[in-house]
């Protein structure tokens, strides 16, 4: 059975940022290999989430209905990672990390992770150091 990789989207998400990972998961990490994962979308509610590019995405799960059993959580970057909406993601990330889940964050989502101290004790990449300091501070 395929394991789900949850792509967490906020409104005004960066639609291009999760694309290559989702393609690899959905078709086999190595071309022709067994497909072990399936990408699924999680958003604050089950309402349509709109991307920066204007795409409208219907989530598979809301924050309240997302499964407890999944392979990984991917926070896709976008324009709302410094918003009150993003604060709803903190307990989701805390729970994922406590349960040993893989958690990835792209672009602005990595600054969100830094701002909440999730990157303090792990090696990570992000945008430029000045950018990370601006949005994540010294958390």
Language model features with spans:
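Extended, subdomain-level signal for the structured scaffold at the beginning of enzyme domains
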Residues: 1-99, 112-121, 132-139
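Short, hydrophobic beta-strand segments that form beta-sheet elements in well-ordered domains
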Residues: 40-43, 103-107, 123-127
């Amino acid at each position: 059975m395929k394991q789900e990789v949850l792509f967490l989207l906020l409104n005004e998400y960066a639609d291009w940022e999760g694309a290559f990972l989702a393609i690899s998961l959905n078709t086999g990490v190595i071309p022709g290999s067994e497909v072990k994962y399936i990408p699924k979308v999680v958003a604050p509610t089950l309402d349509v989430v709109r991307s920066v590019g204007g795409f409208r995405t219907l989530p598979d799960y809301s924050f309240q209905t997302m499964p407890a059993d999944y392979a990984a959580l991917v926070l896709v970057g976008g324009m709302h990672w410094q918003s009150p909406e993003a604060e709803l993601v903190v307990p989701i990330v805390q729970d994922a990390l406590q349960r040993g889940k893989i958690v990835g964050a792209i672009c602005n989502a990595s600054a969100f992770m830094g701002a909440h101290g999730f990157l303090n004790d792990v090696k990570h990449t992000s945008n430029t150091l000045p950018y990370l300091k601006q949005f994540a501070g010294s958390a």
